[in-house]
């Protein structure tokens, strides 16, 4: 059945001078099957509960984000990395709904778990902003930075599609940014969660598109 919402979301074209690539929370705490959440699940004897998440990260997200980073760097386009985690050893700066997981996986600044995956590591001079909430708009200088760049189009990648990615993208849309969830650049705990977040986002909030299409549209393929 056709969704009536489509008529209210006419879409937009990406422009290289106005766009930034946003890499969300691709850290050892949440994006590695060997550290952080992956290690916790293994130690608990239930690694299969993370299998779908980490299989997609390893086989789809990392290669996709690597291609996007390479293209954006080659064309000197804007890149910003977001991380999530505590700035304090007692995790007291995190809201109650985020603190238990951060504590369980050791996600605090200065620990390996807080670092971005080596395969996606930022280069010198690239922006890395930490947040202590799911949305970067509430606990970092993200909005101030991208507005200073003259950016009003944002390409979102990373984890998890249904939490920090969608949370930041929703807030961006409410602030007038034109947003794209890069479908093959995002992932969640399950395909169902990822697909639901993508479906919901594209109804009224922005676009959901493939990395190949956005790079072609930007002339950066």
Task: Give the residues covered by each predicted segment.
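Active-site-adjacent betaalpha module
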Residues: 1-20, 34-38, 66-75, 86-90, ...
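Short hydrophobic beta-strand that contains or immediately precedes a catalytic carboxylate
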Residues: 22-24
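Short acidic, Gly/Ser-rich segments with clustered Asp/Glu that frequently serve as metal-coordination loops
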Residues: 26-34
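Surface-exposed cleft-lining segments at the edges of enzyme active sites
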Residues: 30, 51-57, 155
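A solvent-exposed, charged loop/short amphipathic helix patch at secondary-structure junctions
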Residues: 34-54
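Short coil/turn segments at secondary-structure boundaries
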Residues: 52, 56-59, 104-108
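Alpha-helix-centered segments that form part of catalytic cores
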Residues: 55-66, 118
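A basic- and aromatic-enriched beta-loop-alpha substructure that forms the phosphate/nucleotide-
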Residues: 80-85
